[in-house]
């Protein structure tokens, strides 16, 4: 159910509804499930009053959208960014519900956060904000109820402050947050999980659609947007495998490398971002050019693999056309809803045209590695044990392979297209239908629709 002025949520709902149409035509009883699943189970909105370093009271809006618990405790990140509003959090929680279903783990869907901006704030100000935020949120979360995590603006520092506040308020040490430090309940591979998982998913896509562009070849050219956690570890995994990364970006522009990034340079980017710096300051390095106000997609003449990793709606229709002209074969979202609806239409039309077309993977499938390892962190916490890096990475690879297989099968069966050997199935339809069926069936079994 869309309220007025919720464009992001409307976009996510429209995408799901369109993808589900062939399935709903064949199974009309599920139309009632769609009507009900789009309404969050609970929406929490509260004020967050905190003291800045000058002793002045500041106020922000706090939110938690507890979207769906049919498959397990609500699970989804906390976003701290000035753009945060209810429409964005409803869209993210809605997407999270079906993304979590695709991991095969027992997790429901949720999302939360605040319009607080951690940029430019001191550690003390962030700590005071986090303690105030948790002062309300703690009533509504817990390891078997709702398990938040990090997101944009919420890194290890913020998770630590939030965990500490909860521990003081509840007087208990539980796994009620994921993304924790390794010495106090965190999991190996969690920081890397979204980026690594994206590449594990993309490797399956490449093997089926365009093995000539495998990631063990330096001649395979990869464009990545963003420069935060997702983009950094996506780039590091691509470089480790042997392909060439040509771009990163931030909110002010894009940094393009003619010869390709190195692991050392990505680590330099990570250090810069920890200090709140801009990629523009690295443009003087040899072979790196900064383009203010532009995203990477129109700046590179040849791209084989495009991986949006910044934020929602970061690939427009015009940029999608530019990617087609650059020869792109795979577009997989590291960000949530990274492509606009018009851009997705262009990619899907290219896929339907046959050999040489673009194969597009939506974020709910391709970037589910992050929440998958959050689920593995929950499992480790519940058993009071810690798995090794190799164990977690192996489980992540298995989850991404299973997710790819589920999406491929459902896309083949329910896309409503007359597929031939030359036309690839729609992973967009596959992800939406497979995730929806799993959630809807659980809801029906629990009496949420009939």
From Swiss-Prot:
Keywords: NADP, Oxidoreductase. InterPro entries: Aminoacid_DH-like_N_sf, Glu/Leu/Phe/Val/Trp_DH, Glu/Leu/Phe/Val/Trp_DH_C, Glu/Leu/Phe/Val/Trp_DH_dimer, Glu/Leu/Phe/Val_DH_AS, Glu_DH, Glu_Leu_Phe_Val_DH, NAD(P)-bd_dom_sf. The keyword Oxidoreductase applies. SMART domains: ELFV_dehydrog. The keyword Amino-acid biosynthesis does not apply. PANTHER family: NADP-SPECIFIC GLUTAMATE DEHYDROGENASE 1-RELATED. One of its GO terms (biological process) is glutamate biosynthetic process. It comes from Hebeloma cylindrosporum. It catalyses: L-glutamate + NADP(+) + H2O = 2-oxoglutarate + NH4(+) + NADPH + H(+). Belongs to the Glu/Leu/Phe/Val dehydrogenases family. This is NADP-specific glutamate dehydrogenase. The lineage of its organism: Eukaryota, Fungi, Dikarya, Basidiomycota, Agaricomycotina. GO terms for molecular function: glutamate dehydrogenase (NADP+) activity. Pfam families: ELFV_dehydrog, ELFV_dehydrog_N. The active site is at residue 111.
